[in-house]
Amino acid sequence: METATRTHQQRKLISSFLDITVNQTVEIATQFLEATTWNLEDAINLFLIARRNPHHHHGEELVPLPLPSKKNTLYDYDPFMSHNTSVAVCPEEIWDDESTSEESDSRLSSLYRPPPSLFFHGSFEDAKATSSREDLWLLVNLQSTTEFASHLLNRDLWPHDAVFQAIKSSFILLQVYDDTSEGQKISTFYKIDSVPPVVLLIDPITGQKMRMWSGVIEPQGFLEDLMKYMDSGPHEHVASLTSNKRMKTEKISCSSNNADDQDMATFWGNAIEEEKTVIKSGKEETFTSDRVVAPSWGPEFEDIMTLSEHEEETCLSCDLLEFPVLTEEPKADCDRSVVCSICVRFPDGRRKQRKFLKSEPIQLLWSFCYSHMEESEKKEFKLVQAIPGASKTLDYGAKATFDQSGIANSMISVTWE
């Protein structure tokens, strides 16, 4: 059984090695992994060093095969069982390498190193306490050093501009590995059966798992899912649950008092019947209390009504505003370096996403929002950018581009004036 497990682990490491190095053979992958006692990171770095070595003769293989390592130990060493350690592994250390003097940005491994400033550095309990104290949702990323999808998450999801900003503003992100005691505790407690990578959204106050993603996660879909939790923090969520329970209790209490209310209604009905009188107007016209006599409000009330109508016209004056014509959205094959993506959240909860050229004026964002409003909603509105620790109201009169204004690849909320 133990031999079968080891063989399965080795096959996964070989597969990951081939995915990263590209166009290499199983034999080369096996030799490099064996030379580094089946350590994927060391094997890849050794492969890169060997490939860059200029001292090879014409006709020889481009990648020289490494010599197998030899070690003398006092006891049998099992590389797969030795990963059971209580020491947490920092995510940025997985791809760190001090075995070569080459610049980190020239190594293939630098592509798979996640942004260290995005992650919480500490234990799961510390992350939960900090999230609760700062009223932020807790995201837990369970990774695996042997699953290539985990490295893809570090390369494609966490460095994504919009995802990075969303997490910084409303979440705390903890990354742990499944071969540590911390990762195993989380897997057991939340009954995670999926193969890493797995991302959990946790209420830090109650510890409840609110949402889970697994496998290769696309940034756009992940961002849309996160935005559902950015309108309110965990404290407001718990307060709403408490409020719902209180409302149910009040309904039960109200139903028990219905009989008393009916008795009071009967009492007042009888009293009204007894006090029916004949009302005579100046023209001697007769009315009874069964008929409602409309009061005369006088000119003062008419002035107030006129003022209210004027205010309503002012609120709807946005209909007269002319926004610039919305340009055509950049195509998918457009150069990504000149394109930005904006996600807009409307007051009714709808979310729309659109791409703009970074060189285009930000006034087009008002045009985009206005085009997605119903006729009954078209009134004065403002656009607010959610940034960590504060919010920024955008200025329509500012003559700036998306790139100059700093709102490229961000989330914008529409609020009524």
Swiss-Prot record:
InterPro entries: Thioredoxin-like_sf, UAS, UBA-like_sf, Ubiquitin-like_domsf, UBX_dom, UBX_domain-protein. Residues 335-415 form the UBX domain. GO terms for biological process: proteasome-mediated ubiquitin-dependent protein catabolic process. SUPFAM superfamilies: Thioredoxin-like, UBA-like, Ubiquitin-like. GO terms for molecular function: ubiquitin binding. Keywords: Ubl conjugation pathway. One of its GO terms (cellular component) is nucleus. This is Putative plant UBX domain-containing protein 14. It comes from Arabidopsis thaliana (Mouse-ear cress). The gene is PUX14.
